[in-house]
UniProtKB/Swiss-Prot annotation:
EC number of the protein: 2.1.2.1
Name the UniProt record assigns to this protein: Serine hydroxymethyltransferase
GO molecular function terms listed in the Swiss-Prot or TrEMBL record: glycine hydroxymethyltransferase activity; pyridoxal phosphate binding
GO cellular component terms attached to this protein's record: cytosol
InterPro entries assigned to the protein according to its UniProt record, in alphabetical order: PyrdxlP-dep_Trfase, PyrdxlP-dep_Trfase_major, PyrdxlP-dep_Trfase_small, Ser_HO-MeTrfase, Ser_HO-MeTrfase-like, Ser_HO-MeTrfase_PLP_BS, SHMT-like_dom
Organism: Roseiflexus sp. (strain RS-1)
Pathway: One-carbon metabolism; tetrahydrofolate interconversion; Amino-acid biosynthesis; glycine biosynthesis; glycine from L-serine: step 1/1
Signal peptide positions (record): none
Complex formation: Homodimer.
NCBIfam families: PRK00011.1 (NF000586)
Gene3D superfamilies: Aspartate Aminotransferase, domain 1, Type I PLP-dependent aspartate aminotransferase-like (Major domain)
Amino acid sequence: MSTLQTLWRSDPAVARIIDGEMRRQRDGLELIASENYASRAVMEAQGSALTNKYAEGYPGARYYGGCEWVDQVEDLARERVKELFGAAYANVQPHSGSQANMAVYFTFLRPGDKVLGMNLAHGGHLTHGSPVNFSGQLYTFVAYGIDPKTERIDYEQVAEIAHRERPKMITVGASAYSRAIDYAVFRQIADDVGAFLFADIAHPAGLIAKGLLPSPIKYAHVVTSTTHKTLRGPRGGIILMGEDFENPFGLKAAKSGRTLMMSELLDKMVIPGVQGGPLMHVIAAKAVGFGENLQPEFETYARQVIRNAQTLANALIARGYHVLSGGTDNHLMLIDLRNKAVSGKAAQEALDRAAITTNKNAVPNDDKSPLITSGIRLGTPALTTRGMKEPEMEQIAALIDDVITHINDDHVINRVREEVMALCARFPVPGLEPST
């Protein structure tokens, strides 16, 4: 009983569930693009005594006493992430990427303001204007998408829509787009129409941080990210700015009358605007994760993530799969399964039975519901954390093809599952041992 020892004694029901999830992660291939394996150090920080501490406010300006240690860890997290991205400002308190985005929208916009964001069906995100999300309910979103031929962002269309609609903000970022984004072009479009540029880099953040993809830091007025995914830290959010600037809304400090900086408005919007007490144990884990990201070996990891994704995409293309845009520049790919006559839901469920975890995903012009979809999204961050490289990607492509080609054949799926478990045994998850 190497882990969860106290939990097995005090609450075996919960211990059993956690142990089952640990075994699932250990014994299966994780290809969900937004998932990764946090280090043991990150998890130790997140499970520390900082869980017990309330710390509303910011370092040096808390509403509670006894914050001398949590002040230090929040300062450390902020300094590390600023160094990582070359940012002048960082807020590490958002509980999630969605709450970071909410704080940005609430700071820069008013209800009903017009925003230009990427179509969810073309690779965008719920918080970029989906009508079922607060963003689409509070603001007037118009969508840009990908070119139907190249399956890449159509920058001419973006400019055309922006000039026609005159949005107050342009949101750039995606959850299922496999190509590098030209933030300089987006900034030029934003400047041409007098819009703020907001970049959500939740998915490629780790690759951007190591200079392997273009960075929006010097182009966007504000940037958000999650801290897991390609950053491989705890689940959480951050807000960044490449440079601070005076707010353009005429807001003044109550006593001095000076113009408030945007950093001050963002800080006030995070707390008390959209959150209360920060999760100090998670902020400590963020600090640990950022420290790991700053090490030279993380660049080696990030480069391998991209090489693995490109190898996997090419191997699937060679087997007749429609990978959108014909490949990938980052950690993920979107597979349109319509030429295989298989739905995303059916593929996901069959792959689950083979211990290959993916997620169904809508594709452009999808005629199926979001609960069914015509595609799946694949990513390589977690596989790369296990130490897998190009040869394993070739093998995994063959296993995926076996399952989808024989989607109703339990014999094939069981054989693939055995191969998956053997492969996983060769590449254990760092720091994740079974508890019994």
